[in-house]
């Protein structure tokens, strides 16, 4: 018997205040980058097939895995830069994005020169370590009066895109070769660098619960919802 590794769906139910008939479910899949390694056929990695029929795609970029970012951030105090083996593994994030493009277009039976309309949110993770690099005062919170301000989303995305073009242009090129609708988002689940801890003689790094302050982690999903189910999410007037 052949057992294949498949991503499990995360299902969330949304209730609309307008009542029955407007409720919906959101289904998320979390794919590892290894699922999109070049040379692996769809038959060998069937867990990637759903991506071609998804209503939206999220791509999480890890700056600490990138040699370009590591050079720019040399001397940063984040302990993740000093972990054993950190920086020695091959950074394939641009290759994974390129392979994602190939898989999606093959499964949709479209030309490699065509682009899909499906929105892609490119999330720049661990953005708290990039605040000095990004001129963080230019990055604004895009939710105003319980509405998503698309103008702010656009401006934030332009700042991130410009930065990525300088630091890792292949991510931008490969993302925009796949979709007509790509936006870039700064996110950080912890909002601060983890700290070194020792437990039972073993050394670890972990976030400090007292310092947890997530950065814009909900914004990519709000933007995606605006495209997938626009009636569920009000946007600021004039956008």
Please give the residue ranges for each predicted region:
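Short, small-residue-biased leader/transition segments that mark boundaries at the very start
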Residues: 1-3
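Switch II of P-loop NTPase G domains
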Residues: 6-56, 66-72
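Canonical P-loop GTPase G-domain recognition
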Residues: 129-225
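Structural and coupling elements of P-loop NTPases
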Residues: 185, 233-234
